[in-house]
Structures are given as structure tokens and as C-alpha cells.
Amino acid sequence: MFTDYGLNGPYVGQLHAVVAYVAPDAPAIDLMHDAPARDPFRSAYLLAALAAEMRPDSICLAVVDPGVGGDRPPIIVSVDGKRFVGPGNGLFEILQRRSSRAKAWSIDWRPEKLSSSFHGRDLFAPVAAMLARDEWPTCSPLGEGWREDPGRPGANWPDDLAEAIYIDGFGNVMTGLRAAGLSERAKIEVAGKLFSRARTFGDVAKSQGFWYENSLGLVEIAVNGGSAARQYGIEAGAPVALRN
């Protein structure tokens, strides 16, 4: 499960309750529930990075849905054997763009009771659980042209996002830039500060800031023994620049 619901309150528990009822034998894993709130744009880059570590037959219930109850379609996206269920608001744009084998379906199935404000519980969770039982709800294929439609949500988003997209509990600042291919000498500028590359925390002095390739393959700003976000005043959405 990947959502922006947060762990406080009743929302995540209700997702688990639905999945456990519909597919009691399917393990449900909380991937993260503090995705960028009401922000499918930045969440799309985070989800794409996390998806690379999922096993090929995974089913991911992913909900960052500020337009819940509106006209955005509910969809299933299959990417390299992994299936994602959630809103068609661009949340799956980056992961499908990075794959040569992506298909999508619009979900036609509807439950008897559908809250206008909680499609995660009433629509997406049951569909994800059905897929976990090898059952397909009523769907309509979006066809081969859906990936080329310039009007689809997220069509104009960049392949890599030069912004801070997530700040973890340690104050490390994850960006939407992939580290693969960047020079060892490349510097990252954010909040008016230039950061050099290091392999890991112990390679720099205490309280020193640096950037490194994190476990998801993204550029991350960190401080050895401290919080990069607090020390340098970096917030989610801060622009990031690559300097050679």
C-alpha cells in the first residue's frame, strides 16, 4: 500500500480491513503512508523509485487522490508484471513511462456503496484484493494509444524531477533525480548550498552535508549525524540543480 493518508486516524486500517475481508490469504504490506500529501505529481516519482524494488507479481494499492469523487478515472496499470490500482491522475505516469511493457485499464466495476470521498476503501482496495485472488473486476482496456495521449494527466511532467520530493524522519532530503549516470564529481545545489558526492555517511565529517545515491537509486541530500532539512532549511518542493 502506498498512500498519503498518514498512520494517524482510521483510513489505513480501513484499507487493511477491506483487503483482509476480500482476500484473507493475501499479505498486505504498508509500503508508505506519508507520500507527499494531495500531491500526485511528486508522489509519482517516489512511487516509480519504490516500484523498482517490488517483486514482479506484486499488486500495489496506490492512492494519492486530491480529486477523489471527481472525473479522474479509476485505473489499473500493469508495468513489467506489477499491477497498480488507483486514480488516473498522473500518479502512475512516471513508472509506466520508464517501462517498455505497460498496459492500462479503466475500472468499470463499482461497489454497491461508494463514498464520494473514500474511493481508497470502497473502490481501489476491493479491486486490488480481487487481483490478489486472481480475479479481474469489470474493466475496459485503454488501448495502445493511451501512453501517447498528450492530454493524459502527467503527460508534460519531466522524466526526472529536479526538486526535493520527500523528507524522511532523519531529515534526509530525497529528490526526484535518478543518480545513475551522474559523475562522481557532480555537485548538487539546493537552498543556495553546493553538495559534493559521497558514497555514504561515514565518508564525510560529522555535521557535513553531502549527496549520495540512496537505496532507491535517487539523489539524496544528507548530513552525517544530523538533519539536512533542518540544517539547510530545505523543504519539500525546493528546486534542485545539477552542477558539474
Question: Which residue stretches match the model-derived regions?
Answer:
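Residue-level marker for buried hydrophobic side chains located in beta-strands
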Residues: M1, C60-A62, I165, I221
